[in-house]
From Swiss-Prot:
Its main location: cytoplasm. It comes from the Bacteria. Its cofactor is Mg(2+). GO terms for molecular function: ATP binding; ATP phosphoribosyltransferase activity; magnesium ion binding. Gene3D superfamilies: 3.30.70.120, Periplasmic binding protein-like II (3.40.190.10). Coiled coil: none annotated. HAMAP family: HisG_Long (MF_00079). GO terms for cellular component: cytoplasm. This is ATP phosphoribosyltransferase. It comes from Chlorobium phaeobacteroides (strain DSM 266 / SMG 266 / 2430). It catalyses: 1-(5-phospho-beta-D-ribosyl)-ATP + diphosphate = 5-phospho-alpha-D-ribose 1-diphosphate + ATP.
Length: 294
C-alpha cells in the first residue's frame, strides 16, 4: 500500500474533555503535543494526524469522513443521529472515570415534580432532539429551546426547566436547581467512519488504539506490587492479597524463597503493605501501571 494512504485522521474533543482525553492517550502511549491556540496537536507517529474539535460536532464529521476516527459522547451520537461505527466504550469524563448524566432539572421552589408537569412549559437545553424524544415518550407537549450555554442560570425567568449534563450534580445544586429525572446516561465512545472501518489497514490501527485506550482506563486506580517471601509464609501472604487474579509466583535462587507479583487497587496499598510485611514479605515495592490489558 502506498505510504501516503497510511495515515489515520483522528478527531480529539476540544473543551471540557480535552485534558482528560490527552492524559488518557498519553497513558495509552500516544503523546500528543498541543501548542497554544493551535487546533492541530502533533505526535511522533507519522501514521496519525489529529485535529481538535468540539465533541458536539465530532460524530457528524466522522460520518462525513472528515475524520477516520474520533472520540465523542454517546449523547452526541444520539443527538446528531450520526451513522458511525461505535468501536469502543471509554468510560471516562472530564473529572472522573464514570459516565455523565443528562438530567431534567427545575428550581428548588418549582411545583414541577415529574415530567408530566412539563405540559405547556418551556425547556432550555443543548440536546434538543434528545429532549423532544424524551417528552414524546412520556406523552408531554412542551416547547424546547436550544441553549448556547450557561443553561443553569435560565430557570425560572428564561425557562421553566432545563435538561443539562452533570457528573456530580454540584453545579446544579450551586444554582439552586433540583433534579427531577435522569433522561440519559452517557459515556465517551471511540467511533469510526464506516468506509474507514472497512479499510483493513485503518481498521487494524483503530482496533489497536481502542485496545490501548481501554487498557489505560482499566489501569486507572491500580498499582503493581512486587515482593519476596519465604515459602513457609506463602499461604498467609496469598490469603491477604486482593489481587485481580492469583498472584504470579516465581522461584528464586534460594529454594526456600519465592517472588510474588500482583496488581491491586491503589486504595488498598496503605493498609496492605504493612500486613504483607507482618506476614513475612520482604523487599516490597510498588509501581505504577499505565495499561492493563484483559
Amino acid at each position: 500500500m502506498d505510504n501516503l494512504q497510511n495515515v489515520l485522521k483522528i478527531g480529539l474533543p476540544k473543551g471540557s474533555l480535552q485534558d482528560s482525553t490527552l492524559e488518557l492517550f498519553a497513558n495509552a502511549g500516544f503523546h500528543f503535543s498541543v501548542q497554544s491556540r493551535s487546533y492541530f496537536p502533533s505526535i511522533e507517529d507519522d501514521e496519525l494526524e489529529a485535529i481538535l474539535i468540539r465533541a458536539q460536532e465530532m460524530a457528524h464529521y466522522v460520518e462525513l469522513g472528515a475524520f477516520d476516527v474520533g472520540l465523542t459522547g454517546k449523547d452526541w451520537i444520539i443527538e446528531t443521529d450520526a451513522d458511525v461505527v461505535e468501536v469502543a466504550d471509554l468510560v471516562y469524563s472530564k473529572a472522573s472515570m464514570r459516565p455523565v448524566r443528562w438530567v431534567l432539572a427545575v428550581p428548588e421552589s418549582s411545583a414541577i415534580k415529574s415530567v408530566k408537569d412539563l405540559e405547556g412549559k418551556h425547556i432550555a437545553t443543548e440536546v434538543v432532539n434528545i429532549t423532544k424524544k424524551y417528552l414524546a415518550r412520556n406523552g408531554v407537549n412542551a416547547s424546547v429551546e436550544f441553549s448556547w450555554g450557561a443553561t443553569e442560570v435560565k430557570p425560572p425567568d428564561l425557562a421553566d426547566a432545563i435538561v443539562e449534563v452533570t457528573e456530580t450534580g454540584s453545579s446544579l445544586r450551586a444554582n439552586k436547581l433540583r433534579i427531577v429525572d435522569t433522561i440519559l446516561e452517557s459515556n465517551t465512545k471511540l467511533i469510526a467512519n464506516k468506509a474507514s472501518w472497512n479499510d483493513s489497514w485503518k481498521r487494524e490501527k483503530i482496533e489497536n488504539m481502542a485496545m490501548l485506550l481501554q487498557g489505560a482506563i482499566n489501569a486507572q486506580g491500580k498499582v503493581g506490587l512486587k515482593m519476596n517471601a519465604p515459602k513457609a509464609a506463602l499461604q498467609n501472604i496469598a490469603a491477604i492479597i486482593p489481587a485481580l487474579r492469583q498472584p504470579t509466583i516465581s522461584n528464586l535462587a534460594d529454594e526456600n524463597w519465592v517472588a510474588l507479583e500482583v496488581i491491586v487497587s491503589e486504595k488498598t496499598v496503605r493498609k496492605l503493605i504493612p500486613e504483607l510485611k507482618r506476614a513475612g514479605a520482604e523487599g516490597i515495592f510498588e509501581y505504577n501501571i499505565n495499561k492493563l490489558i484483559d
